[in-house]
């Protein structure tokens, strides 16, 4: 299937202040978005795709000046693909606090004339959803045919169905969870500690020092990456294979340099991430993950939290995902069924762990293709 081809982001400016869940207010902010396909006359074929931790508005296609810049969900979104841009108008939004053009820690604070840095207010999933709703308003979209996301993006999709029930026809929540477990919060805390303890962090004002806390970011990414893969997947990819600088394949070097393939892989992923991502953004997004808990206001009762939803749901999980295990998706399914909502659920047998939601798995893609076919028939797309 063909790619959607060359795409270009656009920057949307919002003068109306946005009050955040923390009580802080952001005024005169911007959000970077990309769109694919055409919005129909009835404005009924719009799909919002919400991104996960290190992704962005760049969901599909490539940029003219970089043919390697393929969108993070390009295998899923495009002409003839499961989310078919010949039939749907797809929107990707870079969230507040990110480092890919939307207002965030790297942006200039108008009160000081310097980057916000650590002074950028803490944001939540709910704050992102409110900001995304303003994007929808700007496009004249009263109701999305679907809001979809994987992992943290799935949390946003679920939040949309809670916060704007009348504006979401279908919620597609993939490899997600109704709240983080203590173990997941612990992983985030260790990652944040690596960043905060980096001497180049400078209290979050490293921009003024001309440095980046790359050592901390590397470790944070390495920790995260371990949780995205399954044990079986790591065993198949790396096993205990050696990767020594001198090329030896059958002997230990008895040092603390890289000796195993898996070590080399993690260091490569950490180095790559530290080159393009912002440490303050990493702190913000992991804290947003920690705070997401729609049942908290209902004494932990998820069924009560979902009582006023109106959407139809597709919930999907992956058998080897231990970061957000299938049992967590089934919690959402049970709460929705308790509320007599229309729910489709699939647990896909895939060896790739949490990252499976990003990969081109035939069963997974066929599931989404069939579900979007149903939506297309509903909206006449």
Curated annotation (Swiss-Prot):
Metabolic or biological pathway = Amino-acid biosynthesis; L-methionine biosynthesis via de novo pathway; O-succinyl-L-homoserine from L-homoserine: step 1/1
List where the protein spans the membrane: none
Feature type site, description Important for acyl-CoA specificity:
323
GO BP field: homoserine metabolic process; methionine biosynthetic process
This protein's UniProt keywords:
Acyltransferase, Amino-acid biosynthesis, Cytoplasm, Methionine biosynthesis, Transferase
Main subcellular location of this protein, as a coarse class: cytoplasm
Q: Where is the AB hydrolase-1 domain?
A: 45-360
Gene3D superfamilies listed in its UniProt record: 1.10.1740.110, alpha/beta hydrolase
Which residues are the active-site ones?
A: 151 (nucleophile), 321, 354
Per the record, the similarity remark reads: Belongs to the AB hydrolase superfamily. MetX family.
What is said about its interaction partners and assembly? Homodimer.
Protein name per Swiss-Prot or TrEMBL: Homoserine O-succinyltransferase
**Organism of this sequence:** Burkholderia ambifaria (strain MC40-6)
């Amino acid at each position: 299937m063909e790619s959607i081809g060359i795409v270009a982001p656009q920057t949307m400016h919002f003068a109306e202040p946005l009050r955040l869940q923390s009580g802080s207010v952001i005024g005169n902010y911007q959000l970077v978005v990309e769109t694919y396909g055409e919005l129909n006359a009835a404005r009924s074929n719009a799909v919002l795709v919400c991104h996960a931790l290190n992704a962005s508005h760049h969901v599909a296609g490539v940029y003219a000046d970089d043919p390697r810049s393929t969108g993070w969900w390009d295998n899923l979104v495009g002409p003839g693909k499961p989310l078919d841009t010949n039939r749907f108008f797809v929107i990707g939004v870079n969230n507040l606090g990110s480092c890919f053009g939307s207002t965030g820690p790297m942006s200039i604070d108008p009160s000081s004339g310097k980057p916000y840095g650590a002074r950028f207010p803490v944001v939540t999933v709910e704050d992102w959803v409110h900001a995304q709703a303003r994007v929808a308003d700007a496009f004249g979209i009263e109701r999305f045919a679907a809001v979809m996301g994987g992992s943290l993006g799935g949390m946003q999709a679920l939040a949309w169905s809670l916060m704007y029930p009348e504006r979401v026809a279908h919620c597609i929540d993939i490899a997600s969870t109704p709240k983080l477990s203590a173990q997941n919060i612990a992983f985030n805390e260790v990652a944040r500690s690596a960043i905060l303890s980096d001497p180049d962090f400078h209290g979050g004002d490293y921009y003024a020092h001309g440095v980046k806390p790359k050592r901390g970011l590397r470790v944070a990414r390495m920790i995260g990456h371990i949780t995205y893969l399954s044990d079986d997947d790591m065993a198949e990819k790396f096993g205990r294979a050696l990767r020594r600088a001198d090329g030896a394949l059958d002997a230990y070097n008895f040092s603390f340099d890289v000796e195993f393939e898996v070590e080399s892989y993690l260091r490569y992923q950490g180095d790559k991430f530290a080159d393009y991502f912002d440490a303050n953004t990493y702190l913000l997004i992991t804290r947003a993950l920690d705070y997401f808990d729609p049942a908290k206001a209902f004494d932990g009762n998820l069924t009560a939290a979902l009582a006023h939803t109106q959407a139809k749901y597709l919930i999907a999980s992956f058998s080897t995902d231990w970061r957000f295990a299938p049992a967590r998706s089934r919690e959402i399914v049970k709460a929705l069924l308790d509320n007599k909502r229309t729910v489709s659920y699939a647990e896909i047998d895939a060896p790739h762990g949490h990252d499976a939601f990003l990969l081109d798995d035939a069963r997974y893609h066929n599931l989404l293709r069939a579900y979007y076919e149903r939506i297309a028939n509903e909206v006449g797309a």
